[in-house]
Amino acid sequence: MYAVFQSGGKQHRVSEGQTVRLEKLDIATGETIEFDQVLMIANGEDVKIGAPLVSGGVIKAEIVAHGRGDKIKIVKFRRRKHYRKQQGHRQWFTDVKITGISA
């Protein structure tokens, strides 16, 4: 059984017991969360596709950890003009373990 849900402007395909990295959620570690923006649920041959959401579809998950991703560098450079600019960015994330999928 797997499902597709939407969180943080992105869509994620998950199954029960899987750990997923999402955009940062302001919820404490160890708490549970329910995602109700479920786009699709598949259980073998039984597939439910929402238009746009599956009615009654809920994905239950537990917050595992919060953290920051790897640093990326943004570089601006103009040749022959002695102009260089560097900026770094580390995106916050939340790791979530899927505990249940229901339709």
Curated annotation (Swiss-Prot):
Belongs to the bacterial ribosomal protein bL21 family. It comes from Erwinia tasmaniensis (strain DSM 17950 / CFBP 7177 / CIP 109463 / NCPPB 4357 / Et1/99). The keyword RNA-binding applies. Part of the 50S ribosomal subunit. Contacts protein L20. Transmembrane segments: none annotated. GO terms for molecular function: rRNA binding; structural constituent of ribosome. Keywords: Ribonucleoprotein, Ribosomal protein, RNA-binding, rRNA-binding. Pfam families: Ribosomal_L21p. GO terms for cellular component: cytoplasm; ribonucleoprotein complex; ribosome. GO terms for biological process: translation. This is Large ribosomal subunit protein bL21. HAMAP family: Ribosomal_bL21. This protein binds to 23S rRNA in the presence of protein L20. The keyword Transport does not apply. InterPro entries: bL21-like, bL21-like_sf, Ribosomal_bL21, Ribosomal_bL21_CS.
